[in-house]
């Protein structure tokens, strides 16, 4: 294993020493300044790399919003076409269960209820 020698301020040294003491009290016999320092260095390096990925564009909110809008629009168009087929189907007309005047308010109510689960304030704004 490669060796790295670093200098730290007294506060950092005391905190690492405290961690070693706690680990030894927990029964971890191989706890040492070297082991704990190595663990902290690895964790810090992981955090640093994650931050760099985010800066380089790991997640793009605008692209996500665009993708979600596109998919929701497709689903809405498909549902509209399916609803048209159901309303125009002679069997559906004969049964009376697929009257557009009844279906549309039921769909609107369902959508409002689902949205209000996550966005309860929006329901108050619409009324």
Curated annotation (Swiss-Prot):
Cystine residue pairs: none
Gene Ontology cellular component terms for the protein in this record: cytoplasm
Subcellular location, record wording: Cytoplasm
Keywords (A to Z) from UniProt: Conjugation, Cytoplasm, DNA-binding, Plasmid, Transcription, Transcription regulation
Extent of the signal sequence: none
GO terms, molecular function: DNA binding
SUPFAM superfamilies assigned to the protein according to its UniProt record, in alphabetical order: IHF-like DNA-binding proteins (SSF47729), TraM-like (SSF140581)
CDD domains per the UniProt record, alphabetical: Tra_M
Subunit organization: Homotetramer. 2 homotetramers cooperatively bind to DNA although they do not contact each other; cooperativity is achieved by DNA kinking and unwinding. Part of the relaxosome, a complex composed of plasmid encoded TraI, TraM, TraY and host-encoded IHF which binds to the F plasmid origin of transfer (oriT) in a site- and sequence-specific manner. Interacts with TraD. Probably also interacts with TraY.
Family classification: Belongs to the relaxosome TraM family.
Protein name: Relaxosome protein TraM
Originating species: Escherichia coli
Protein's gene: traM
């Amino acid at each position: 294993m490669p060796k790295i020698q670093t200098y730290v301020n007294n506060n950092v040294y005391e905190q690492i020493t405290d961690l070693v003491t706690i680990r030894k009290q927990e029964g971890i016999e191989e706890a040492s300044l070297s082991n704990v320092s190595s663990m902290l260095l690895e964790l810090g390096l992981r955090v640093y790399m994650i931050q760099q990925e985010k800066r380089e564009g790991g997640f793009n909110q605008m692209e996500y919003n665009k993708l979600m809008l596109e998919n929701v629009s497709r689903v809405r168009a498909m549902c509209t076409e399916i609803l048209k087929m159901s309303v125009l189907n002679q069997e559906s007309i004969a049964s009376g269960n697929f009257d557009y005047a009844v279906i549309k308010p039921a769909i609107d109510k369902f959508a409002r209820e689902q949205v209000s689960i996550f966005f309860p304030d929006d329901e108050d704004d619409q009324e």
